[in-house]
Amino acid sequence: MTYRILITNDDGVASPGLMAVYEAVRSLGEAVIVAPASQQSAVGRSMTLFEPLRIEKMNLQGTMAYAVNGTPTDSVIMGMYVVMADRKPDLVISGINIGENLSAEAVTTSGTIGAAMEAANQGVPAIAVSMHVLEEADKFATAAMAQDYAVAQRLIGKLARQVLENGLPEGVDLLNVNIPAGATPETPVVVTRLARRMYDTIVHHRMDPRGRSYYWVDGTIVADAPEGTDLHTVHQRRQVSITPLRLDMTACEQTVEIERIIRDNW
């Protein structure tokens, strides 16, 4: 039976990173692109509940694609239950995101990872792929989309084949892959754990011409992430980070301690 691969992202259906994934995996089976119609960065795993979703067919460099007027999670759901309703995909790949998605902070805010988490929630293994860029401003700049995806494509092809043929290890629902800026085929690939956070939060206060306050949420990158974390691996060591993730976020190690606290205080 031919493998089926659903490709999505959070940068929108026009992002070159989407086609880069398609080119990397098209030889492995039937690859289908279903992605947000517009930029959806930092929406996490949110979904649309209070307005209808629409799917528009479009041509991407000669390839049929489907644009969804919703979030990355909406795109995964529409991909599985509408576009590929006859048979679910065997793998979902989200990316290639322009800008790294590192730390536990990114897991809960990134639309790229959110799409992969929704795939896992639907019982389909998933890979989220992001590329580190050196300038923060490039993360949402159209011009920055013209990246060299060759190293990422090579890695995606290898990972996709492995997951399609063997699945993910028990207890792993998805892989979060981050490729450092300037990576080459010789760049080491390291299995990592999540850093706690990627940014120290900053809130900028401004005044509009009518004297009313408004705010921009911003941040500076954490510079002292522990060794072995995804953030340290990509930013300090300039190595490829692969972090295995699971949907169950229960802090099992502390269950007994929480039970003691409840018992002693209620």
Swiss-Prot record:
Record's protein name: 5'-nucleotidase SurE
Keyword Metal-binding: yes
Database matches in Gene3D superfamilies: Survival protein SurE-like phosphatase/nucleotidase
Cofactor note: Binds 1 divalent metal cation per subunit.
Keyword Hydrolase annotated: yes
Stretches of the chain forming a coiled coil according to its record: none
GO molecular function: 5'-nucleotidase activity; metal ion binding; nucleotide binding
PANTHER family in UniProt: 5'-NUCLEOTIDASE SURE, PHOSPHATASE, PUTATIVE (AFU_ORTHOLOGUE AFUA_4G01070)-RELATED
Positions of a divalent metal cation binding: 10-11, 41, 97
Protein family per UniProt: Belongs to the SurE nucleotidase family.
Class of enzymatic activity (EC top level): hydrolase
Task performed by this protein: Nucleotidase that shows phosphatase activity on nucleoside 5'-monophosphates.
Record lineage: Archaea, Methanobacteriati, Methanobacteriota, Stenosarchaea group, Methanomicrobia
